[in-house]
Amino acid sequence: MSNRPRGIALALALGAAGTSPAAQAPVAPRAAGAGIAIGRLAWADREIERAELPAKSSWRRLAAGDALRTGDTFRTGELATARLDLGWMTVTLGASTMLTVPASSVLSTVLEQGRAELAGPGRDIVKIRVGDGEVRGGGRLVLRRSVGRTSAAALEGAFRVRAAGRTVEIRAGQGTVVADGRPPEAPAPLPPSPGDLVPGRDPAYVRLGRPVELRWRATAPAHRVELLDLERDEVLLARETGGPPLRIEIPWPGTFRWRVSASDARGLESRPSATGLVCSVER
């Protein structure tokens, strides 16, 4: 799934062409603290790329198992899902998302655009900068970053959101919205979770490579559907949609769980629904 680095081959080709050192562009120095291994790419469905250090002028596609380093910037494709195991926390990236791990002795992350779900036990284990603000806490948090606005939804635990000199604490089941240049809004309840999933506890069977139709009771203008491992709460693929129904193709054989969450007009995301079951069979 990943492409091998091409820097050595490129250097040899330039040397063979007789390019003198004086004619070559200077190499940007590596930032202090960059390149330190901090985790691995635990899962990738579709495209996730990393900007290559030190100049970050080119991107390389990653594969599950690849090492992650301080100074890295990641971006996902339009339908991609990726899970980063950073040791101190797990970050699940949604589609069209960009995230950076700064080259710093203080481990943190920066969400530049898109959706990230961060999970880490303990107090203040999660540290992330987004827009003009910063979020700290422990538990499970969903952040959505769009132009000029950030939404934060606490699914578990508690988090402090700070921007424009003001700090707001959100606890499980609460969220806040931050407009760039302004303090966080007062904590508000998250939207209600969708319900009445079909298929539900009785699984639907679908042939591998054929789409399965998923339906639910909508509770907000936008929804996110996730396919999960049968035993673990690990998202394998996800799709953003308006309302039901949604037809998705499962590219692997096996039995999976699925669930759906809702997002209101401000971008606050609900807790996930209960799960339904889907079986993808080869024939």
Residue ranges and their predicted role:
Residues 237-242:
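Short beta-strand segments within Ig-like beta-sandwich modules, predominantly Fibronectin type-III
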Residues 267-278:
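Extracellular fibronectin type III
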Residues 244-246:
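Short strand-edge motifs at loop-to-beta-strand transitions and within beta-strands
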Residues 24-202, 230:
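Flexible, surface-exposed loop/linker segments and immediately adjacent secondary-structure boundaries
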Residues 210-214:
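Structural beta-strand segments of beta-rich domains
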Residues 44, 217-222:
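Short proline/glycine-enriched turn/loop motifs at strand-loop junctions of beta-rich domains
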Residues 248-255:
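Surface-exposed, short loops/turns at beta-strand junctions within beta-sandwich domains
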